[in-house]
Amino acid sequence: AVIISFILGSSLGIWAAHNDKVSAFMRPINDTMQTMPSFVILIPFVMFFGIGEFTALLAIIAYAFVPAMRYTEHGLRNLPETVIEAARMIGCSQTQLLWKVKIPLAMPVIMLGLNQTIMFGLAMLVIAALVGTTGLGQLIYIGLSKADFGTGMISGVSIALIAIIFDRTTQAWRIKLEKKTQ
């Protein structure tokens, strides 16, 4: 779900960075999605698709694509204009400008978006246990419903460790990319 969220979010971010109308349309949607409690996002998916893994997948994608889109758009919109102008002067096409200049320069910011997409996905995974998913989120839910401290804590700590590992890994990638683009 995180991979799909990141691909969807970064694609929309690229589009929004190059089209002010798309950016203006998506901004209130992103603001709403980020301020809405994560549990509330499940409601329309449960109403339309029922309870199950597919519903949880869609809810995770809907919740986690927002940071990927925001960070991608932000990274692409805040590039040094001199570098973009230099690339145009040497004859880069729009496609070359995007893939060979803009995205590599914006990659450290885009990696922050990936980091946040992973964190949002993991957060929604725990909430999605309420709609019948299996895995660590379900174990937390079982631990809560049966007042089983051990099961809940082990599952919660496991998810926290997974989040920390992904966080540190994406931060290391971002730092390497920042060194390359400087």
Regions found by a protein language model. Name each.
Residues 2, 10-15, 42-44, 48, ...:
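Alpha-helical transmembrane segments of multipass membrane proteins
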Residues 17, 27-64:
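Generic hydrophobic transmembrane alpha-helix motif, especially the helices
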Residues 47, 76, 121-162, 178-182:
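Glycine-rich helix-loop "coupling/hinge" segments at transmembrane-helix boundaries
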Residues 68-110:
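Short cytoplasmic-facing helical segments at TM-TM junctions of multi-pass membrane proteins
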Residues 36, 48-49, 61-65, 72-76, ...:
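Hydrophobic/aromatic residues within the transmembrane alpha-helices of Major Facilitator Superfamily
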Residues 168-182:
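Transmembrane alpha-helical segments of polytopic membrane transport and secretion proteins
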Residues 62, 94-128, 150, 154, ...:
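Transmembrane alpha-helices
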Residues 1-30:
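Transmembrane-helix boundary motif in ABC transporter permease subunits
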